[in-house]
Swiss-Prot record:
Cellular component aspect of the GO annotation: ribonucleoprotein complex; ribosome
Protein's UniProt name: Small ribosomal subunit protein uS8
Entry similarity comment: Belongs to the universal ribosomal protein uS8 family.
Assembly: Part of the 30S ribosomal subunit. Contacts proteins S5 and S12.
Annotated InterPro entries: Ribosomal_uS8, Ribosomal_uS8_CS, Ribosomal_uS8_sf
Role: One of the primary rRNA binding proteins, it binds directly to 16S rRNA central domain where it helps coordinate assembly of the platform of the 30S subunit.
Leader sequence segment: none
Keywords, ordered alphabetically: Ribonucleoprotein, Ribosomal protein, RNA-binding, rRNA-binding
GO molecular function, one term: rRNA binding
GO BP term (any one): translation
NCBIfam families registered for this protein in UniProt: PRK00136.1
Lineage start: Bacteria, Bacillati, Bacillota, Bacilli, Bacillales
Length: 132
């Protein structure tokens, strides 16, 4: 079966694993998924990410992060730009998520970055998702 939106699938897997407080999850790998996972790790939303090569597509193993009393670090994930309706933002129109408490993942010509990085570099792009 062909997957029409692999990024939405990855975000949904993270959201579902987070809701039931799983320690880790696995998703089929791709370059953009790896960039998104690395960005989530850098911003402190996930604990770790590792790539497992299997002579085919590969697998990303994502380790979720929880607080001291097992509270969730990720409270929400939302896919914004979808295959049927792409959402783009100019450099001065890059959105803020919850007044800076969350991040917007923006796919630019310089790679996937947060909304803060995109504003600093004065570059726009496709608004992939919101994480808070």
């Amino acid at each position: 079966m062909v997957m029409t939106d692999p990024i939405a699938d990855m975000l949904t897997r993270i959201r579902n694993a987070n809701m039931v407080r799983h320690e880790k999850l696995e998703v089929p790998a791709s370059k953009i998924k790896k960039e998104i996972a690395d960005l989530l790790k850098r911003e402190g939303f996930i604990r770790d990410v590792e790539y497992i090569g299997d002579n085919k597509q590969g697998i990303l193993r994502i380790f979720l992060k929880y607080g001291a009393n097992n509270e969730r670090v990720i409270t929400g994930l939302k896919r914004i730009s979808k295959p049927g309706l792409r959402v783009y933002a100019k450099a001065d129109e890059v959105p803020r998520v919850l007044n800076g408490l969350g991040i917007a993942l923006v796919s630019t010509s310089k790679g996937v970055m947060t909304d803060k990085d995109a504003r600093q570099l004065q570059t726009g792009g496709e608004v992939v998702a919101y994480v808070w």
